[in-house]
Curated annotation (Swiss-Prot):
Binds 2 [4Fe-4S] clusters per subunit. One cluster is coordinated with 3 cysteines and an exchangeable S-adenosyl-L-methionine. Coiled coil: none annotated. [4Fe-4S] cluster 1 binds at residues 68, 73, 79, 308. Transmembrane segments: none annotated. Its cofactor is [4Fe-4S] cluster. InterPro entries: Aldolase_TIM, Elp3/MiaA/NifB-like_rSAM, LIAS_N, Lipoyl_synth, rSAM. [4Fe-4S] cluster 2 binds at residues 94, 98, 101. It comes from Shewanella woodyi (strain ATCC 51908 / MS32). It is found in: Cytoplasm. This is Lipoyl synthase.
Length: 321
């Protein structure tokens, strides 16, 4: 049996090429077998606007990336028009192959040492008051990218002293304590790490990740920074039950997580995991009530909710659906 061809740095693998070597194979969906989107998910998206064009141009001119574009987020137009964006640092190539995610897989390029300064200047030019900084998984880096996160936070605050910063971090697999030591030098205003789904679905949805590791990351950060809110997000529609999701919410609270986002999974292409169920808005409302009953201070639950969707409003405690 021949070895698989070695990936070249900077080459993006998507769709079938991306998911070809995951433990639970994804069978490409046929159109006639795909669930029809219900009316509550039919959102009319504007093709463009001056604000959308301005933000895209600012990103392009500085060589920056937004997860809004790279992950094909359905809320891109709304968020860009609102003047918010979630910046994706450390490149646009992930070392993982999660079959729910539309971000490309491959061998990433070396981190751009100038990215923290370019990011800070772009945020200043855009006059943003609240930003979310996330990244691809960088298993190729000894610290998982933690130092780059800290550098970005420091540079952003130097140019934007009044800004609030939320970080949506990867799991720093195998290097949690080292990563947290680094992040302690520049802690964010909100610390976010997504569990994504219930543990029994990790093998098919999050190959390479571990449910308990992710919970431990959130708990250990909170122990070090008790005044910084911790946050996590989940998708629904991957085959989980509401009872399984309720147990995940209990696990999050047991690990001192205070903020929650819960939204509907949408299949990016026929090569990604299929949607097994569209969850009605009423069920999201029921889970929001349950989350608040067990102690979450903020719970944004609804079909179109994403981890960074109106993150500024979530942080203010305003209701987001």
């Amino acid at each position: 049996m021949s070895r698989p061809e070695r990936l070249q740095p900077g080459v993006k693998l998507r769709d079938a090429d991306k998911v070809s070597r995951i433990p639970v194979k994804v069978v490409p969906s046929e159109r006639e077998t795909m669930l029809r989107k219900p009316d509550w998910l039919r959102v009319k998206l504007p093709s463009s606007s001056q604000r959308i064009d301005e933000i895209k141009q600012a990103l392009r001119s500085n060589g920056l990336h937004s997860v809004c574009e790279e992950a094909s987020c359905p809320n891109l137009a709304e968020c860009f028009n609102h003047g918010t964006a979630t910046f994706m640092i450390l490149g646009a190539i992930c070392t993982r192959r999660c079959p729910f995610c539309d971000v490309a897989h491959g061998r990433p390029l070396k981190p751009d040492a100038q990215e923290p300064k370019k990011l800070a200047q772009t945020i200043k030019d855009m006059k943003l008051k609240y930003v979310v900084i996330t990244s691809v998984d960088r298993d190729d880096l000894r610290d998982g990218g933690a130092q780059h996160f800290a550098d970005c936070i420091r540079e952003i605050r130097l140019l934007n002293p009044e800004i609030k910063i939320e970080t949506l971090v990867p799991d720093f697999r195998g290097r949690i304590d080292a990563a947290l030591d680094i992040l302690a030098t520049e802690p964010p205003d909100v610390f976010n790490h997504n569990l994504e789904t219930a543990p029994m679905h990790y093998r098919k949805a999050r190959p390479g990740a571990n449910y308990q590791w992710s919970l431990d990351l959130l708990k250990k950060f909170k122990e070090r920074h008790p005044d910084v809110p911790t946050k996590s997000g989940l998708m629904m529609g991957l085959g989980e039950t509401n009872e399984e999701i309720a147990q995940v919410l209990k696990d999050l609270r047991a690990h001192n997580v205070e903020m929650l986002t819960l939204g509907q999974y949408l299949q990016p292409s026929k090569f990604h995991l299929p949607v097994e169920r569209y969850v009605p808005p009423a069920e999201f409302d029921e889970l929001r009530v349950f989350a608040e009953e067990i102690g979450f201070t903020h719970a944004a639950c609804g079909p179109m909710v994403r981890s960074s969707y109106h993150a500024d409003l979530q942080a203010q405690g305003k209701e987001v659906k």
